[in-house]
Amino acid sequence: MTEFSHARLDGKVYTAKEIKEIIKANNVKFIKLQFVDINGQVKNMSVPSEQIDKALNNEIMLDGSSIKGFRSIETSDMFFHPDINSFQILPWRGSDGVNSARLICDIYNADGTPFEGCPRCNLKRVMQEAEKLGFSMNIGPEAEFFLFAKDKEGNVTTKTQDHAGYYDVGPEDLGEDVRSDIVLTLQEMGFDIEASHHEVADGQHEIDFRYADILTAADNVTTFRVAVKAIAAKHNLHATFMPKPIFGINGSGMHCNVSLFKDGQNAFYDENAEYQLSETAKYAIGGMLKHVKNITAVTNPLVNSYKRLVPGYEAPVYLAWSLANRSALLRVPAKRGVSTRVELRSPDPACNPYLAFAAILETCLDGIRNKIDPPAPVESNIYKLTSKERKKQRIDALPGSLAEALEYMDKSLVAQAALGEHIFKEFMTSKKKEWDSFRTYVSQWELDRYLERY
């Protein structure tokens, strides 16, 4: 069975000796042992660089009871297992002005087994299931974000940095310099940047980086979010990956370009098949369409996520696939051959990428195992169809709220298989509490509408 690890763009496979030499040559003082919790929040323990041997020998412990969704206090001893290929000197200095480096870590139990609640370990488990069928998955994520101004006291506002639109340039696009700084920083960290541009909404931006294997892609999304926030802060701005921070304009998505490979070849491509899409591709599409409602709580995990998933703002709402039609949930871009892929348009950038990518992979595998045929592609603008027309074409819709998404997820064996027993249980518990907190909160909208009238 393959031991999956982070794949560097330069193909470099580090040794412990090389890492220690880099640390010494660059006067690195601290090593950040980084991981994510079940909600995808980045956590880290910082250790002096003199502890690098101990870190690389998997000897540094953490208290799992202090991490939401991990361990109870009586079984809380856990260990960092760094992925040596993820070593990276951070291009920005902290407030202390010293150099730091980062290692992305798996979390292991005290008995030396992978912790079933570690999102990164869980993704590796699902990757091993795909490997048994001969498949590996590549994903190219397209994460959007907003840049907001800060007030004189440094507090975050919802005032966008500019009022530019899609593909605009300066002087309307005031974020151009910030984006350039982010791109240069990401390139310094080993990212292959393909494009950057202003998005549709005021203050909204997108930076696209090259696809990678599913584990490396999840690592990259996590690193991307940290880097974007760090560089924005340097410009006295706040970057947010909140899906819908402002009412009435487009929200931020994270379209995922998905492809499966087998024996080194793109398994979605068949030169002689209809649309040049292989049977494997069609089964994967069938699996995604069948199960997408069951994993939407994972790919769109916030109460706020569902403010984005509404008609009228270019967000996918309806369950259909197409060859070019951007009103469909799944789209097959024009390129074929090694570039054949399916674009899933519903995920948002607030998701835990390790869990979201595991869920996407599991839906594809279920489609392949059970030979789930997709319906015919829909090439008309689904947003313009009446509800009667959609019903006639059997075009369903995504869940309209986190509560509805959790109801679908709770009954889904595919979602349970994707997350594993521990994460599934902890995720459901956490998200139900989040919904209850929102459901019982008295909002300003209610006060404005009801306080004087009633």
What are these model-derived regions, one by one?
Residues 2-454:
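Glycine-rich, acidic/polar active-site loops that bind/position phosphate-bearing ligands
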